Amino acid sequence: MEIQEISKLAIEALEDIKGKDIIELDTSKLTSLFQRMIVATGDSNRQVKALANSVQVKLKEAGVDIVGSEGHESGEWVLVDAGDVVVHVMLPAVRDYYDIEALWGGQKPSFAVGAAKPWSAV
C-alpha cells in the first residue's frame, strides 16, 4: 500500500471519530524514519484514546502493519506508528505546549494563530 493511501486511511479514521485540527506533514526530506506525520486533537482523554484506536483498527483492516503505539494509559498524547506514517493524537493543551508541527516544519493550525484558545499550556 502506498504512503498516500495509508495517510488517507488514517485521516479518515480520525474524521470518523470527530478528530479536530487534523494536519498532515510530508517529512520525507527531513528524516528517513518516516514519510508522513499526522497530528490531530481530541477533546478529552477518552476521545484521544478512541481516535488512536480508530486509526489502528482501520489501518490493520487494510493490511498495514502497526509498528507500535504509546500513550494509551493517560490519553493525553497517543502515538500510532505505522512505519512510514506516524500519527499523533493529543489533547489541545498538550498539542499547544509541544507544538510538534513547528518542530517538523509545519504551521500551527488556524485555531492557534491569533485565535482565542479555550485552554492554556501550563
UniProtKB/Swiss-Prot annotation:
Keywords: Cytoplasm, Repressor, Translation regulation. The keyword Cytoplasm applies. GO terms for molecular function: ribosomal large subunit binding. It comes from the Bacteria. GO terms for biological process: cytosolic ribosome assembly; negative regulation of ribosome biogenesis; negative regulation of translation. InterPro entries: Iojap/RsfS/C7orf30 (IPR004394), NT_sf (IPR043519). Belongs to the Iojap/RsfS family. This is Ribosomal silencing factor RsfS. It comes from Chromobacterium violaceum (strain ATCC 12472 / DSM 30191 / JCM 1249 / CCUG 213 / NBRC 12614 / NCIMB 9131 / NCTC 9757 / MK).
